[in-house]
Amino acid sequence: MSRDPKLSLSKFLECLNEIEHEFLRDKVEHRPVLVRKLQELQQKTPKHVAKLPHEPEMIQQIHQAAHRIDIVAQAFIRFDQKFVSLCSEIVHDTTKVMQEANVVSPGEGCRNLSEDLPAYHMRNHFLHTLENPYPTQEEKEGLVRLTNESTARIRPSNAIRPPLEVHQLTLWFINARRRSGWSHILKKFAREDPSRMKRLVRAKLSSSNQSTPPSLTSEKPSDDLDVVLSDNLGRPLTLADKQQFEDDWASMISWIKYGVKEKVGDWVYDLCAASKKTPKPGMPRPVTTVAKRHPARKTKPAAKPKSRTANPRASTTPSIDSTLDSSKLESTPELSMCSTADTSFSTFGSSLSMSHYNPFQDGNDILQSPTVKARGNRKVKALPKRAGKQQPDEVDNGKIPFLCLSVAFV
């Protein structure tokens, strides 16, 4: 076309159709060629338009071809613009999702936090918001969703475990602030002032060459840690204060990264789940009642009543005759009136004679021991005397009031 100095309507239409077909083929390497052809055609057309014959039909076809090229060119321009816009949106959305999920590089993740922990996302959020670990409602919902998704993805065998809820996450953050020591640092080294705690966290992160949260990068540089500590304490900083703060800070970071309770492996949960007996099909589900939940108090069994049967009572008075066997002795009701408590001669009256006291044939035996030889070689031990009224006839006859009244022999 450039070689032909003379331009006709037919050639002009042919050039437009060629450019249109090349546009539709959409080859990247042809785009500079198409641009150059359009530029040459634009330069030559004004010079020859006035000299061209008036052919309405040919002119109409040229207009239609030019309109189609314009539509195709605008469509490609929009495609390119939309492609750039979509790429930008994808990059922005991906960055936002990664920030919400707090995804870090594999090396840093292995050093800082284990993704296998059930509370990984909550701990990571706590670690990135140390100056104010109070998530908003929107952040809580996002953390709950991420935790449930990651738990279902990492441990599909534990799908029976109920999903995390927002109120459980709220309780976790309340306990985390207290158990990690964050509340202790806020109270002791920041006077329970959130603004002072914010300055303290920024100063500590800057002094330890740790990355600060994104929300703090736009603010003024953090102060020196010693200056902030001295200002928060309201007195000159001592080595003991500095060491105490460093110990509390290290303990807090260690708890956030590696919770003691969550260091337990999945096998513990599997073991606990396996230990629970599954009910057999068709068996009724046991209902836990108050009586079953709290077993009845164990009561001491009632003591059996002691037998009131009177044991045979023998005299506790030591026997003078130790050679005699006392294991075969018995007491009888007839001997209840006899007394062996006092067998000495001191009880006798001075006016009485021993010749009047001879109730037994063997007087020497009865004086030596309260044991009496009964019929059939049965030995009977006398019981202590029971006091009784003295009979006047006995006194008159010269008998002793302390004598045994009756002795029965079996």
Curated annotation (Swiss-Prot):
Organism, scientific name: Mycosarcoma maydis
Region (Disordered): 203-224, 278-335
Record region (Highly conserved between B alleles): 111-410
Not essential for B3 function: region residues: 333-410
S-S bonds: none
Record's GO cellular component terms: nucleus
Primary role: The B locus has at least 25 alleles, and any combination of two different B alleles yields a multimeric regulatory protein, that activates genes responsible for the pathogenicity and for the sexual development of the fungus within the corn plant.
Positions of short motif Nuclear localization signal: 276-308
The protein, known as: Mating-type locus allele B3 protein
GO MF, any single term: DNA binding
Listed Polar residues bias regions: 205-219, 312-335
Family to which this protein belongs: Belongs to the TALE/M-ATYP homeobox family.
Location of this chain's protein in the cell: Nucleus
Keyword annotations of the record: DNA-binding, Homeobox, Nucleus
GO biological process, one term: regulation of DNA-templated transcription
Main location: nucleus
Record region (Variable domain between B alleles): 1-110
Biased composition (Basic residues): 291-307
Matches recorded under Pfam families: Homeobox_KN, Ustilago_mating
DNA-binding segment(s): 107-184
